Regions:
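Sec-dependent N-terminal signal peptides of Gram-negative exported proteins
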Residues: 1-11
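Long, charged/polar, soluble alpha-helical segments
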Residues: 9-139
Length: 139
């Protein structure tokens, strides 16, 4: 029963993120969503609920990827939009630290889901960092 209620709340939360019309806020909310999912993944890990754990870990990567897509949809080169890219990069770096700790704590059965999400987060982080550190395009 509790998981059904939790699943409903999560679906509403994700829909609220996707419905945000302002791209900058959408990117921030997507990272908020990712952080909440990682916190929930830790709780599910401690309680032993493997299905909810896997879903929460995957939600973390989805949120970070959606943040990157929202930032890219702004249409500006990242070096011209550092105000939004750099905070996103820092928050994804924090997510990477947290998911690495979770990977080290997770059991061997749970580890593949965490490793896959960590790989996806690393890809998002590298894309954000490359964008921030790249030179401005010539006009």
């Amino acid at each position: 029963m509790f998981s059904l209620v939790l699943l409903t709340i999560l679906a509403i939360d994700w829909e609220a993120v996707r419905a945000e019309p302002v791209l900058e806020k959408r990117a921030q909310r997507a990272l908020d969503f990712a952080q909440e999912r990682l916190t929930e993944a830790r709780k599910h890990y401690e309680s032993g609920d493997d299905a909810a754990f896997t879903k929460a870990v995957n939600g973390t990567a989805e949120g970070a990827e959606y943040c990157l897509a929202s930032l890219a949809a702004m249409g500006k080169h990242p070096s011209q939009n550092v105000r939004h890219y750099k905070p996103a990069e820092m928050r994804v770096r924090e997510l990477l630290r947290r998911i690495t700790t979770l990977r080290n704590d997770a059991s061997i059965e749970q580890r593949p889901a965490v490793v896959e999400s960590e790989r996806r987060l690393t890809a998002v982080h590298e894309t954000l960092l490359d964008g921030v550190m790249s030179k401005r395009p010539r006009s």
